[in-house]
Design a protein with these regions (language model features):
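C-terminal subregion of chymotrypsin/trypsin-like serine protease catalytic domains
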Residues: 214-245
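Short, solvent-exposed secondary-structure boundary/capping segments
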Residues: 37-42, 179-185
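PDZ-domain C-terminal substructure recognizer with occasional recognition of PDZ-binding tails
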Residues: 2-40
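Terminal peptide-recognition signature
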Residues: 15, 54, 209, 213
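Catalytic nucleophile loop of clan PA
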Residues: 197-218
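Generic structural signal for well-ordered beta-strand positions
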Residues: 24, 65, 216-217
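Charged, low-complexity helical/coil segments in non-catalytic cytosolic or luminal regions
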Residues: 19, 47, 55-183, 192, ...
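Short, Lys/Arg- and Gly-enriched loop/turn segments at beta-strand edges
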Residues: 1-4, 24-26, 164-167, 225-229
Length: 245
């Protein structure tokens, strides 16, 4: 966009935009700043990237779902409009531990040469795309989908390198009528995970929740007041969202 703007100079320019989903054409006249660069007074975000967790993969269709919540603009908190995207392998290099009032995060590197497959949608219930049948990251046995109940459960998460481990959690409460993906309250009880991360941190979104040998949901949010507690989305809600993209 910048290169086109500089080529056009200060001549009036027609921009085709979308405002709340509706197309709109605007005419703008660029101005030169103190450095002589043509500007239109708009902050344009053309891409973003982050670490998250793949929740499920269907070998029959190649479809996958991740995060359990949408990717939002960090300033407006609005769901980011989706153009195109890819899923890349990442390696966790460090952890900023979560604490009361401060969300932690996983920090790592992306393998930019390892494009695993395209994303096709960014929704309130997760991001969705496809992986090839020979994807080497897919391993293990398939699990049936089930409904969460209050009680002990586990999550699978990668908080160091590329190793996925299973950690103990407790499903404290089900919130089946929640409309924002916060359909259950969970508490991390595994001492190893608490020691490593302080509880739930950014980057663990999408970590699958397993209970009684079934896939019942995914981790979505952390409680800022207590990093050992957070929310999860039910697997049924996430799968329904994936089928409708």
């Amino acid at each position: 966009f910048q290169s086109l703007l500089q080529k056009n100079g200060t001549d009036a320019t027609a921009l085709e935009i979308k405002r709340q989903g509706s197309p709109l054409t605007l005419s703008v006249e660029p101005e030169r700043n103190e450095q002589g660069i043509c500007c239109i007074g708009a902050w344009i975000r053309d891409s973003m990237a982050g670490i998250g967790t793949v929740t499920y993969y269907d070998p029959a269709t190649g479809d996958f779902g991740a995060l359990g919540h949408g990717i939002t603009d960090g300033d407006t908190m609005a769901l980011m409009p989706f153009g195109s995207g890819s899923i890349l392998p990442s390696t966790v290099k460090a952890v900023k531990k979560g604490s009361s009032g401060s969300a932690g995060e996983l920090r790592g590197n992306f393998d930019l040469s390892g494009d695993l497959g395209p994303l096709c949608a960014n929704t309130d219930c997760g991001i969705f795309g496809t992986l090839p049948a020979d994807c080497t990251l897919v391993a293990g046995e398939a699990l049936p989908v089930g409904d969460a109940v209050e009680g002990p459960a586990t999550i699978r998460a990668n908080v160091s390198g590329d190793e996925v481990r299973e950690y103990a959690v407790e499903i404290l409460k089900r919130l089946p009528n929640a409309s924002d993906g916060r359909e259950m309250v969970i508490s991390v009880t595994d001492p190893d995970l608490i020691a490593a991360t302080g509880g739930i941190v950014q980057g663990m979104s999408g970590s699958p929740i397993l209970q009684n040998g079934k896939l019942v949901g995914a981790v979505t949010h952390v409680l800022l007041s207590d990093a050992t507690k957070g929310y999860g989305i039910s697997m049924e809600t996430m799968l329904n969202a994936g089928e409708n993209v």
